[in-house]
Amino acid sequence: MINLRKTHPLMKIINHSFIDLPAXSNISAWWNFGSSLGVCLMIQISTGLFLAMHYTSDTLTAFSSVAHICRDVNYGWIIRNLHANGASMFFMCLFLHIGRGIYYGSYLYKETWNIGVILLLTVMATAFVGYVLPWGQMSFWGATMVTNLLSAIPYIGTTLAEWIWGGFSVDKATLTRFFAFHFILPFIIMALVIVHLLFLQETGSNNPSGINPDSDKIPFHPYYTIKDALGLMFLLLVLLSLALFSPDLLGDPDNFSPANPLNTPPHIKPEWYFLFAYAILRSIPNKLGGVLALLASILILLVIPFLHTANQRSMMFRPISQTLFWILTANLITLTWIGGQPVEQPSIIIGQLASILYFTLILVLMPLAGMFENYMLEPKW
């Protein structure tokens, strides 16, 4: 009997990608986040589709249409809560996935890593335009503040900002186009995910030890499908707990008020997953300098593969690099906290020091640690 799974043109691709895929036998739970991100994307697209059926992208009715979804649409409240908190879960998995890549040296698969960074930027853009759609106070002022950063670009800045707005300020045209962007971007993300996986198939997955695992491979199914299923259960448990028990925990109270261009909130801040970059932006007094630092805080991921100086790929057996990695993690948590604080002392100086430390760790200390560890491993007799 012919095995359709291995012969059918379409099934064959799925089989080689998810069933008979040779996987390293020692990959840990840190490798679960790729599949978790895939499920997050599916949840976001499916809940988003149902929300788009009832949402109206008009400044007069956007806020009330979201209220209508929660009050009058059948199960609208759970769809909206899953979508809003699903974004937080998405970014949580993204940050852990990137952290794992840095810790275990997965960034040395340069093509996969670079597509991953492009994916991160696309997801951030999608989340930003999505946050504007409910047209609450923080939606409106967040959109005004972030799009206004474009005006810091010399010569073309103001023209560019007005082109994005579709007028002289954030208004109806802006909301309509942001809804269009928010609808199309997840499908672009899906295409990029396929490219990300294609590049990963070329090299095979990395593993905690960082050494070539070709001599010891096992099939992806059933070993890692079961393991991923456990990770997905945890993901869904946290997501459902958030959506059902405290759906507004990660939101901003200001967004319960309709957008009012005449009333500025006392403290404009983005969602929690952008706060680290927002803190870096705020730590530089100059507008253009802040925008460049904001971009650098994300694009620095692209230079990490070129800063790898250690002879070993993974940090598993490199205690100095491990220490620096966990300092970087603590530093990012500090930046996230500072980004949510009002602009006053001591928050300003803490933010500036944490921003300097962020770039110093990645650009200077981690490459130096790799070189020092190489020296320590050299035989001295």
UniProtKB/Swiss-Prot annotation:
PANTHER family linked: CYTOCHROME B (PTHR19271:SF16)
GO biological process, one term: mitochondrial electron transport, ubiquinol to cytochrome c
Binding site for heme b b566: 97, 196
Pfam families per UniProt: Cytochrom_B_C, Cytochrome_B
Binding-site residues for heme b b562, renumbered to this chain: 83, 182
Keywords, comma-separated and alphabetical: Electron transport, Heme, Iron, Membrane, Metal-binding, Mitochondrion, Mitochondrion inner membrane, Respiratory chain, Transmembrane, Transmembrane helix, Transport, Ubiquinone
Protein name from the UniProt record: Cytochrome b
Species in which this protein is naturally found: Sminthopsis hirtipes (Hairy-footed dunnart)
Binding note for cofactor: Binds 2 heme b groups non-covalently.
Gene name for this UniProt entry: MT-CYB
Membrane topology designation: Multi-pass membrane protein
InterPro entries on file: Cyt_b/b6_C, Cyt_b/b6_C_sf, Cyt_b/b6_N, Cytb/b6-like_sf, Cytochrome_b, Cytochrome_b_C_euk/bac, Cytochrome_b_N_euk/bac, Di-haem_cyt_TM
